[in-house]
Amino acid sequence: MTAESNYLDAIEALEEDNRELALEHARKAVKIDPEHVDAWRVISDASLPGLRSQPTLKQAAQSLTAAKKVVALQPDDLGMWVRGGRLLSDELGLYMEALQWWQDARHQAPDEVTPIVEQAAILADMGLYGEATERLQSIFDENMDLATTQYSRVARLHQMCQLASQQDPKEHFKPWEKHHDGWSAITLRMNKAPISESKIFLIISTPLLMLEVLMAPQVFGPGFGGFCLTSLLILFTVILGMRISRRWFQRLNRPAFNLLRAMDFETSTGYVVIPEDIRISKLFMFILSRRPPAFQERMLKIVDAGDKLKGDWKPT
């Protein structure tokens, strides 16, 4: 059979959601013709478990390898650039490699805004807010077009960076600094799971709302006018409660966000920085259990390897 015949069989198998058979035919196609870009694309697609499932470490690695082949053969395939970047950062936690991946994508598609937004998001997650701000600013300086779905994300990233710029840079948690105050904050909260924003909202707003419902008839009186005033008061309380809850959510869960950053640092660099007592804590297990399976597998391999961070390491 020719490479094209195997490719067509792979497409048919993939449409029937028979991923193993699709992989078998697609691999035969690229063995015959190593530059069959469509077959490599099928390998990347079929290596992933599907929309409702998250890939294992092996599946993510296989899909990423095929995606690299696709962009090498067809550099203008933005879809594969996006897939590779998401696999590197979201599934595997390889933030350093993801930054370079998106930089390569920018060279191939200089007018595309997606690589810049993704770089800014990664830099913000790593605590490098200055660099993230520069990426976001370049979008506006170059008057680049944003998709409707990207506006809210860019606005959220910009707000995060603006708030960070108002803080002392020393307050920004840097996992590679052994004696940073952020480690002490993590230690204090390591035996408690993060508190959800909805729970904070209920704690703050429920007593006030109950009091308003009980007191409103006496204050505003019966009738339609009293009902309208009561509704406005409840609406104001809900909006105020949501704003306060959001603020307290960030403050109370800062140790959890710090630990999340430390975990991302470990998977990005392959170095172990989290102390053992924190690694076996309730907070660490809570966060790890909510990370993708591929991320969890990589984290365990890094811990087993036990490579400690040495010297005065700094991000470059």
Describe the role of every protein-language-model region.
Residues 39, 80, 115, 148-150:
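TPR alpha-solenoid repeat register
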Residues 192-265:
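Transmembrane alpha-helical hairpins and terminal membrane-anchor modules
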Residues 1-32, 42, 48-55:
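Alpha-helical segment of the N-proximal tetratricopeptide repeat
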Residues 16-25, 51-69, 92-104, 127-135:
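Structural signature of tandem alpha-helical TPR/SEL1-like repeats
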Residues 2, 36, 77, 112, ...:
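Residue-level recognition of tetratricopeptide repeat
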Residues 62-65, 124-147, 159-163, 169-181:
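TPR/TPR-like (Sel1-like) alpha-helical repeat modules
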Residues 11, 44, 49-55, 89-93, ...:
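Short coil/turn linking the two alpha-helices of tandem helical-hairpin repeats
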